[in-house]
UniProtKB/Swiss-Prot annotation:
Residues 297-659 are cytoplasmic. This is L-type lectin-domain containing receptor kinase V.7. It catalyses: L-seryl-[protein] + ATP = O-phospho-L-seryl-[protein] + ADP + H(+); L-threonyl-[protein] + ATP = O-phospho-L-threonyl-[protein] + ADP + H(+). Glycans are attached at N45, N64, N110, N192. The gene is LECRK57. SUPFAM superfamilies: Concanavalin A-like lectins/glucanases (SSF49899), Protein kinase-like (PK-like) (SSF56112). Involved in resistance response to the pathogenic oomycetes Phytophthora infestans and Phytophthora capsici and to the pathogenic bacteria Pseudomonas syringae. Disruption phenotype: Increased susceptibility to the oomycetes Phytophthora brassicae and Phytophthora capsici and to the bacteria Pseudomonas syringae, characterized by stronger necrotic symptoms. It comes from Arabidopsis thaliana (Mouse-ear cress). Coiled coil: none annotated. The active site is at D462 (proton acceptor). Residues 333-595 form the Protein kinase domain. It comes from the Eukaryota. It is found in: Cell membrane.
């Protein structure tokens, strides 16, 4: 049987830089992962209770497909007779697995998300520790895991010899180089996993593990491939030396020639440590005396930035770009590279040298307290997240008096420009209903991740069309986390500042100054209405009864003409059901009463047709005579152009605690 081989991820020697968060070529390295001996990928170092991840930069379309993977790897334990925890080959919906834990969680899951069906993660684990809580069979096994660490199939490490059919045991912690073969037949719905010594070039006919199951429901349309590993109180070094992916059911012969020998685990040398310590102390005293004057001047000059960022950078910092890299990428921050500007600063388009990756660079000053606050808010929230519907923060830079944030470039701009463009410029294509409906679902999915799926709750506090960006495929990504706040699950946020954009601020936020996930839902409801109607919340030039978008939609609903609220270009009969659903759901989300609004999980279920709106929804809305904008701010907005407002922050005189 012949197969068309698609070498999407070549046979690699993973040559990567060593840092907390770095990328090179096809793979992104995070946490303890770095380049090791001879350029091999080293997933961990000698740090205890740590983990490393290495994921390919480009997703692979393996849903509804057959595929074959081959990995050459080796494990070097700290102690010859006792393992650490293990490593895994991972299929992930995102590039990287944020919030993962070390030890028994293998750098894949954590205590909160382990076992959740929404993970969409499949892992082939090479486990060198028996964890009773996950039902491990022993401390030297291979397992197939779906969405959690309890294996759906597992077997002790080894292989079946083709000559005599006998099972030959292998020790994962033998420091020997081994090969792992992962082959899935979409036609037969069967996953085969084979482990064998690296010196055997042809895989045995009988697999170590076979799972008869359709894997398509667990994969998204595009899946990221990667490796994870973790250590506990005992260390181990995990090497990935070669890796190949081929389309189809293929069991290739793989002759490595001379099998490399992995170096032993580093031994502690107390004498050497004492000598180094003595030299370092001497040099430190001398350097401190010589550099004290220069250091004092530098400290005074940059005190503000260092005081706020130093601790955070050490613990959680994403990739830090040099100013030279960004200067070259944006062609010296020239005017023709400028994408936009406002109170936050300027945004420039650029291209990273040595690659074809387009980026957007936001430049702002750290002189103002607000500029520094928003800079830190972005890094501490979206800098730690990876989700297909969130704008990806690639890194940051501090140079002189300026702060820089680097994002993926979104070629189709912001949603508000697309909505405005479709009304004012007949030469531009209008958004189709299919595009609008997908945009709404994409933003809802992003908010669900922020509110309910991540380890901590993130309240965005500035949901509006201008902060929804569209990539080359018109997929929506939520951005601008400058006002975002995060807090632990189960705890209420407390704040004395009202932040957001006029018109999108929930009524209770003006009264209490307390931003919650429900205030995000309120703003999202208004965004849904704008997307369907193709207009702003306030239209001064419209007829009096049409000036306020929410009031106008409600009046049309009451008169049985709700469908007429949709923009004319999408007002086709086949779209009626979905359009009216979104309009009603938007009004429900933008309800004045906080407790009536659904959470984002319920919103997505309704959008996906899993749940339905209540039959008496109009009565619920009528009861409060819903108005989309508080009266205190409505008068201001009717007299001013909404475009003239950026993100505003008001100070409240009191704080309300509790719900």
């Amino acid at each position: 049987m012949s197969h068309k081989v698609l070498q999407i991820v070549l046979v690699l020697l993973l040559t990567l830089f060593s840092s907390t968060h770095n990328s090179n070529g096809n793979f992104l390295m995070e946490e303890a992962a770095a380049a090791g001996l001879n350029g091999y990928c080293l997933l961990t170092n000698t740090t205890k209770h740590s983990y490393g991840q290495a994921f390919n930069n480009t997703p692979v379309p393996i849903k509804n497909s057959s595929f074959s993977f081959n990995i050459i790897f080796g494990i070097v334990p700290e102690h010859k007779q006792q393992g650490s925890h293990g490593m895994a080959f991972v299929f992930s919906p995102t590039r990287g697995l944020p919030g993962a834990s070390p030890d028994q969680y293998l750098g894949i899951f954590n205590e909160t998300n382990n076992g959740k069906a929404s993970n969409n993660v499949i892992a082939i684990e090479l486990d060198i520790r028996k964890d009773e809580e996950f039902g491990d069979i022993d401390d030297n096994h291979v397992g197939i895991n779906i969405n959690g660490l309890t294996s759906v199939a597992s077997a002790s490490a080894g292989y079946y010899d083709d000559e005599d059919g006998n099972f030959k045991k292998l020790s994962l912690i033998s420091t020997k180089v081994m090969r792992l073969s992962i082959v899935y037949s979409h036609t037969d719905k069967q996953l085969n996993v084979t482990l064998l010594p690296a010196e055997i070039s042809v895989p045995p006919q009988k697999s170590l593990l076979s799972l008869n199951r359709d894997l398509s429901p667990y994969f998204l349309e595009e899946t990221y491939l990667g490796f994870t590993a973790s250590t506990g109180s005992i260390g181990a070094l995990y090497y990935v030396m070669q890796f190949s992916y081929e389309e189809g059911v293929i069991y290739p012969a793989w002759d490595l020639g001379v099998i490399p020998t992995l170096p032993p685990y580093p031994k502690k040398s107390y004498d050497r440590t004492r000598r180094i310590l003595a030299v370092c102390l001497t040099l430190a005293v001398f350097t401190a005396l010589v550099a004290s004057g220069i250091g004092f001047v530098f400290y005074v000059r940059h005190k503000k930035v260092k005081e706020v960022l130093e601790e955070w950078e050490i613990q959680n910092g994403p990739h830090r770009f040099s100013y030279k890299e960004l200067f070259n990428a944006t062609k010296g921050f020239k005017e023709k590279q400028l994408l936009g500007k406002g109170g936050f600063g300027q945004v420039y388009k650029g291209m990273l040298p040595g690659s074809d990756a387009e980026i957007a660079v936001k430049r702002t000053s750290h002189d103002s307290r607000q500029g520094m606050s928003e800079f830190l808010a972005e890094i501490s929230t979206i800098g730690r997240l990876r989700h297909p519907n969130l704008v990806r923060l690639l890194g940051y830079c501090k140079h002189k008096e300026n702060l820089y944030l680097v994002y993926d470039f979104m070629p189709n701009g912001s949603l508000d420009r697309c909505l405005t463009r479709s009304n004012t410029n007949e030469n531009q294509e209008r958004l189709t209903w299919e595009q609008r409906f997908k945009i709404i679902k994409d933003v809802a999915t992003a908010l669900l991740h922020l509110h309910q799926e991540w380890v901590q709750v993130i309240v965005h506090r500035d949901i509006k069309p201008a902060n929804v960006l569209l990539d080359h495929g018109m997929n929506a990504r939520l951005g601008d986390f400058g006002l975002a706040k995060l807090y632990d699950q189960g705890f209420d946020p407390q704040t004395s500042r009202v932040a957001g954009t006029l018109g999108y601020i929930a009524p209770e936020l003006l009264r209490t100054g307390r931003a919650t996930t429900s205030t995000d839902v309120y703003a999202f409801g208004l965004v849904m209405l704008e997307v369907v109607c193709g207009r702003r919340l306030i239209e001064r030039r419209a007829a009096e009864n049409e000036a306020v978008l929410v009031d106008w939609i409600l009046e049309l609903w009451e008169s049985g003409k709700l469908f007429d609220a949709a923009e004319e270009s999408i007002r086709q009969e086949q779209n009626r059901g979905e359009i009216e659903l979104v309009l009603k759901l938007g009004l429900l989300c933008a309800h004045h009463t906080e407790l009536i609004r659904p959470n984002m999980s319920a919103v997505l279920q309704i959008l996906n047709g899993v749940s339905h709106l209540p039959n008496n929804l109009l009565d619920v809305v009528r009861a409060e005579r819903l108005r989309g904008i508080p009266e205190t701010s409505m008068e201001v907005l009717l007299g001013l152009d909404l475009n003239s407002f950026g993100t505003m922050t008001l100070t409240n005189s009191f704080v309300s605690h509790g719900r």
